[in-house]
Amino acid sequence: MKSEGESGPFQGILRDIEGRRKCYKQDWIRGIKTGIRILAPTCYIFFASSLPVVAFGEQLSKHTGGALSAVETLASTSICGIIHAIFGGQPLLIVGVAEPTIIMYTYLYSFCISRPDIGRELYLAWVAWVCVWTSVLLILLSIFNAGTIITRFTRIAGELFGMLIAVLFLQEAIKGLISEFHAPEIKNQETGKSHFLLIYANGLLAVIFSLGLLITALKSRRAKSWKYGFGWLRSFIGDYGVPLMVLLWTALSYTVPSEVLPSVPRRLFCPLPWEPASLYHWTVVKDMGKVPIMYILAAFIPGVMIAGLYFFDHSVASQMAQQKEFNLKNPSAYHYDIFLLGIITLICGLLGLPPSNGVLPQAPMHTKSLAVLNRQLIRKKMVKKAKECMKMKASKSEIYGRMQSVFIEMETSPPQDNSVATDLKELKEVVMRPDEGGDTKGKFDPDVHIEANLPVRVNEQRVSNLLQSVLVGLTLLAVTVIKMIPSSVLWGYFAYMAIDSLPGNQFWERLLLLFIPPSRLFKVLEGVHASFVELVPYRVIVTFTLFQLVYFLLCYGMTWIPMAGIFFPALFFLLISIREHLLPKLFDMQHLQVLDASDYEEIVAAPIQHSSFAYRKLGSSHHLSEGEDEFYDAEILDEMTTSRGEIRIRTISFKEVHPEPEEKHVTFEPH
């Protein structure tokens, strides 16, 4: 993130507006020109966004006594998404109601019902004042260029925050599952044993449905790497497997014998959008004047915490959506997007809706889906042009020149300096490689070498974000369908979100490392492993991990304190000072830079090749179909990213490439 020219107020916002103004028109033209193919990433990100929002709505309804529900979370996600798609700086960023918002709104509800002069009646009105303060603070942060501060949040903060959210997801799943054995909604005219059996049956069915959803969702999430099935089928299951599993287990819930009451299993509580319970929040602004002045001023305190939380969460999501490995050509807009977030928060507060902000992993998932789309389009045109030139027996320089012209034509923004030459450097070397007699192994093959050497390109546009936000809004018309989902299926979905977010979190990987006996540590080196395993002594890894664990327990413990829990975001800002001043005194700077690196770097035990490339290199006469080509793009990018959407940077183990025993690189210490 650059800071040049941002010394004065408004400088960052003005620079962002100027940068995005130049490409705003093209953002729409590129999306429209993509045609019907834009529906694939649109549907993909729609399901990835809508399911968590429905789950958060159920959680919010449970913790706020029904004051807010899935209707409000869906409405907020849709309205904020449409505003951001049209007016936002970075259109690849996906916004939605997230878990931190649910946590803070739960604390605010607990505070309100404990105060007779506010109570449940003025809960949304007081929260609206909290949103007003939050909005003011976010706008001030953007005006004074606070966006540059986000670079001071290192991996340690992001992974602690991610682990906290994962544990809170798991906690919610466990609490929800236990509540199924005490469901008050399940009533029977008979008492005693019959009533107990119905409650018990509901609980057992909840265990089956939640575990079933959890296991099948985790399995389908990895479908792209399955050995079985056609590429298009594996790709479809990998992209849409989770919503399909929700549909499957919902359908299975209707196979319960008719002798059991209709209230078993328990299903989602969600008022219809046109019912009074859902209509009240649209007019909450008229009740804001009823809030006592003392509480209006007191709303500043949670406003500070929520502003800090949104600033951190929104900026990190934006960073992940535009990682350098995606090779985005359009400029970022961190300051302006924080300013717009302040406006969105104000609108949501006045409408009685929980605000939306940038979400993970949906934001980088959106970018990745558009990278697959654009890579398919570019490769097909380049392969076609190369084959045409080869039929005409054109020279190698002419073949490369024609392919370069296609690449420039398909670029999402005008090329700058020597960017195209740099991006196509490896492909040029392959094309211009001299033939060695009758050896055909080094001969240029468009089907093989273009795929292997084509850089990642993203279709940077606004249409997919706008369409998926509109679809989320249309989901409100399907509330009667949403109410058919068993609540236990959502508890399984919460557990899925928790477990699926752990791979790629180095804090989690180091925690697992603590349970491996020193005599078995060599097993870690036999597979893909994080770079710190070979570069940092084992005792340093243990010490650093224990520090993170203690700090994590402190953050998690604070969420259990009824009133003080609202201050848990302050611990993440305190971590900036700890990282800059305390940790360098406790750890060697080289070790600290590896353990707290900005990139997710992995080391493989031996040189690897992508299976599709190796298959073709063996000279097989079986060519992959068009559908298979498209799938391999998706599989490659899927393997390149962690569960939170972070790009993996893989390097070859020095020990494998240079097996001479003159230097020991593995630094595990048994004691």
Curated annotation (Swiss-Prot):
GO terms for molecular function: solute:inorganic anion antiporter activity. It is a multi-pass membrane protein. It is found in: Membrane. It comes from the Eukaryota. Residues 59-77, 145-157, 217-235, 313-332, 491-557 are extracellular. The chain crosses the membrane at residues 38-58, 78-98, 124-144, 158-178, 196-216, 236-256, 292-312, 333-353, 470-490, 558-578. Residues 1-37, 99-123, 179-195, 257-291, 354-469, 579-671 are cytoplasmic. Pfam families: HCO3_cotransp. Keywords: Anion exchange, Ion transport, Membrane, Transmembrane, Transmembrane helix, Transport. Belongs to the anion exchanger (TC 2.A.31.3) family. Probable boron transporter. Boron is essential for maintaining the integrity of plants cell walls. This is Probable boron transporter 6. It comes from Arabidopsis thaliana.
